[in-house]
């Protein structure tokens, strides 16, 4: 069954949603802790918790994220600004179930390989993809920089033994424009590691569509704006993927 991960994106201690990851496009939804506890109460088994300040290189919410993880009974995937030994150690020390590496996996392949080697399935890699003139390009640093060709980087990560990928079509994220099923399927077909879908989910039908890819290796879906915007409730979403 498809695992759902409600997203809590944190800016300055508050839960927000961005459009296409752009700073300044935030809509605020209250305290990060309240948001996370709300999803837990609604039946989430995982929370996707993102430090957007750290991702954009403008500070961090490290203490707050540790507090949030500590107060939750469910598993947390922690993301945002994890790009060196110090930030990785701090993220893992929160007690989260796993961390997502983004920019670091693109800019520092040797460090990324070591992190994967040392921490195994506690480390996932985020692949933020933008399709430009038919080419699948990766985006780094809050999607501001080009991180190379998706398929070349995926091949390298496969050699390094990456245990899980979080795949985002950045043109879809926060837009409620529907997920990129072709991209998800293509990545899942090229790896034996599980793939988590991120970006664009707008309806229960979108979740049902992603759920059809579980046989190809798509394990979960991160859901953000659709939940916050009231397109559906988390209990409705959990029921839809269990059908």
Curated annotation (Swiss-Prot):
Q: State the InterPro entries in the record.
A: Aldolase_TIM (IPR013785), His_biosynth (IPR006062), HisA/PriA_Actinobacteria (IPR010188), Isoase_HisA-like (IPR044524), Isoase_HisA-like_bact (IPR023016), RibuloseP-bd_barrel (IPR011060)
Q: Which GO terms describe its biological process?
A: L-histidine biosynthetic process; L-tryptophan biosynthetic process
In its keyword annotation, does this UniProt entry include Transcription? no
Q: Which reaction does it catalyse?
A: 1-(5-phospho-beta-D-ribosyl)-5-[(5-phospho-beta-D-ribosylamino)methylideneamino]imidazole-4-carboxamide = 5-[(5-phospho-1-deoxy-D-ribulos-1-ylimino)methylamino]-1-(5-phospho-beta-D-ribosyl)imidazole-4-carboxamide; N-(5-phospho-beta-D-ribosyl)anthranilate = 1-(2-carboxyphenylamino)-1-deoxy-D-ribulose 5-phosphate
Task: List GO terms (cellular component aspect).
Answer: cytoplasm
Gene Ontology molecular function terms on file: 1-(5-phosphoribosyl)-5-[(5-phosphoribosylamino)methylideneamino]imidazole-4-carboxamide isomerase activity; phosphoribosylanthranilate isomerase activity
**Enzyme Commission numbers on file:** 5.3.1.16, 5.3.1.24
Sorted alphabetically, the keyword list is: Amino-acid biosynthesis, Aromatic amino acid biosynthesis, Cytoplasm, Histidine biosynthesis, Isomerase, Tryptophan biosynthesis
Q: Which CDD domains match?
A: HisA (cd04732)
Active site (catalytic residues): 9, 128
Q: Where in the cell is it found?
A: Cytoplasm
The pathway is: Amino-acid biosynthesis; L-histidine biosynthesis; L-histidine from 5-phospho-alpha-D-ribose 1-diphosphate: step 4/9; Amino-acid biosynthesis; L-tryptophan biosynthesis; L-tryptophan from chorismate: step 3/5
State the HAMAP family in the record: HisA
- What is the stated purpose of this protein? Involved in both the histidine and tryptophan biosynthetic pathways.
Belongs to which family?
Answer: Belongs to the HisA/HisF family.
The record's PANTHER family line, in alphabetical order, gives: 1-(5-PHOSPHORIBOSYL)-5-[(5-PHOSPHORIBOSYLAMINO)METHYLIDENEAMINO] IMIDAZOLE-4-CARBOXAMIDE ISOMERASE (PTHR43090:SF2)
- What protein name does the entry list? Phosphoribosyl isomerase A
* Organism whose genome encodes this protein: Mycolicibacterium paratuberculosis (strain ATCC BAA-968 / K-10)
């Amino acid at each position: 069954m498809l695992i759902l991960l409600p997203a809590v994106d944190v800016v300055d201690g508050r839960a927000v949603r961005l459009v296409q990851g752009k700073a300044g496009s935030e809509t605020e939804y209250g305290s990060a802790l309240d948001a996370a506890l709300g999803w837990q109460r609604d039946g989430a088994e995982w929370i996707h918790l993102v430090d957007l300040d750290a991702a954009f290189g403008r500070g961090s919410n490290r203490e707050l994220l540790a507090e949030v993880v500590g107060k939750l009974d469910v598993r947390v995937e922690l993301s945002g600004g994890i790009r060196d030994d110090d930030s990785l150690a701090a993220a893992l020390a929160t007690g989260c179930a796993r961390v997502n590496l983004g920019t670091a996996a693109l800019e520092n392949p040797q460090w990324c390989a070591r992190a994967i080697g040392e921490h195994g399935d506690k480390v996932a890699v985020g692949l933020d993809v933008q399709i430009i003139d038919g080419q699948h390009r990766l985006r780094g640093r809050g999607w501001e920089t080009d991180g190379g060709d998706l398929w070349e980087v995926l091949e390298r990560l496969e050699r390094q033994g990456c245990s899980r990928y979080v795949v985002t079509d950045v043109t879809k994220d926060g837009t409620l424009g529907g997920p990129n099923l072709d991209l998800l399927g293509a990545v899942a077909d090229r790896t034996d590691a599980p793939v988590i879908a991120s970006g664009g989910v707008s309806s229960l039908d979108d979740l049902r569509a992603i759920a059809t890819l579980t046989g190809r290796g798509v394990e979960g879906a991160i859901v953000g704006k659709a939940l916050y915007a009231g397109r559906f409730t988390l209990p409705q979403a959990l029921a839809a993927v269990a059908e």
